[in-house]
Amino acid sequence: MITLLRRPKLGRTSCREISNKMSNTSMVVRNDRMEHRRERFRYNPETTMVIRWGCTSIVPCRNVLNTARAIQEVNDKLSFRRRMNEANVCPPSYFDTESAIEAINEGKTLVVRPGRHAQGRNLYVVHTQQELNDAIIRCDRLGTGWYAADLIHKVAEYRVFVGSGRVIWVAQKTPGNPEDVAWNVARGGRFDNVRWGDWPLKAIKTAIAAYNLTTLDFGGVDIMVDADGECYVLEINSAPSQTSPYRQECVAKYFDYVIEHGKDRIPLSEERGAWRKFIHPSLSEEAWE
């Protein structure tokens, strides 16, 4: 028995449909309803794996896909942004007032965000020192710190679902309003599936580089591309929405593969191989292993 563990108001449809499409027997459990199932959950000899869908609750099972610690790593946007900034995979970022003011004095427009955020909320575009100070005050009220980053004039944005170091699916974000800074699907727009042969390989390589900074087994990497083709990772989501039947099926195949073969990361070849070197072997017989 495989258990997909989710939080209230997060991943209901995604987990249900992925579970339905898996070949292994599975069930979806909401963490706030876990107590009354605890005995069944703890002692059922058929419980072989727990798949955490953005949920860090304690579970009585050692075989877990996405540990609580790994999820916490990427949920702490401030700490993970520092790590990505050191690896040069995100927009140039600033973590103190002095460096942010220096960037503004150089003529840069900045985006300021609190240390924890979601769905495009609490995003402030600043052009002046006064606007910066106002944004920092707003973020400080939330008690999670803040960071600033260069505003990137993007021409495309993707979500790359990475599992065990390989790509499960790629979707391009089509915004409701292209002028918005945050192309968040929760605020309008949609995800369009990208065919394997059309995968943006540079963006995928950068997404995997960011994923490799984590201890996640799987996650959805949000990445944008500017007019010069430069790629910048925004964040990694430990419970990326799966509204498309195609994407649900891809993730189900990946989970089934992990159950049979284990969750070890599959390294990438240094040779050129287009999409075949990046795709997970659960999805194509042409995948490089």
Where are these regions (language model features)?
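Conserved N-proximal alpha/beta basic substrate-recognition cap immediately N-terminal to
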Residues: T3-E106
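Glycine-rich phosphate-binding loop of ATP-grasp-fold ATP-dependent ligases
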Residues: I71, K77-F80, L110-A135, A156-R159
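A short linear hydrophobic-aromatic micro-motif
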Residues: P92-S93, T109-V112, G145-A148, F218-V221
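Phosphate-binding site of ATP-dependent enzymes
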Residues: Y124-T206, Y211
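C-terminal active-site "lid" helix and adjoining low-complexity regulatory extension at the edge
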Residues: D198, N212-L216, V225-E289
